Amino acid sequence: MAVSDGWTLALDTAGALTVVGALAPHDGPATERVGEPEARPGRRGGTVHRPRHAEQLLALADDALTATGGAWDRLARVVVGLGPGGFTGIRVAVATGRALALARGATVVGAPTPLAVGPAVGVPRLVVQDARRKELFLTVVAGDDPTAPDPVPWAVPVDGLAAALDGLTVRPTVAVGDAAADHAVTLRAAGIAVPDDPAVHRVDGVALARMGAVRPAADAGAVRPVYVRDADAIRTADR
């Protein structure tokens, strides 16, 4: 089915939230659905938030399609957030997107997750994500041209954030992302605003769908996660 005649479905599971966006054809209705992680007591006190991507993703997708007047047999394109983020989490969206595209005869498109974080705040913006292991993922989104090359994220130690900001060649005016608020003091000291609205710090499912609707399609096997660093085992206590 041509993209112009069918629905676009966006999936992102790179972070703690499960985010889905649905976009009807011909500038029709668009909506998103967001699944929250499960809160559990931590072994060393506090609360641990366990993502529920595998449990939530397809149900949220079905709900979003239905809400926009769509159905699975009208699916034309699947857009998956490629990360960076949690290794296991990213793979849920990528694997599900590939499978849906194959089963439904739809095209599949990948897009870096940071492009869909905080688009409402404009550009240039800095996306700051929790990379665990006492590190952060940083991505500078310099523009909103869908035909421009994708920004390249990189990892920095938490205690190296100030130095990383000093070395930026493109100066962002605002920072968003799931770790931006935690490092607001450092960011603001560098002249970078950090919004108080929590909604701008997460993936926007509708923005991801709209972005994916105009990106070139790819073979399912060519849609691969953006991990930034190698996946290897590490104790939870050291993350």
Task: Give the label of every model feature segment.
Residues 3-6, 24-52, 106-202, 220, ...:
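Surface "functional belts" at beta-alpha junctions
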Residues 57, 61-64, 68, 114, ...:
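Generic hydrophobic alpha-helical segments
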Residues 68-73, 168-171, 215:
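Glycine-rich phosphate-binding loop signature in dinucleotide/nucleotide-binding domains
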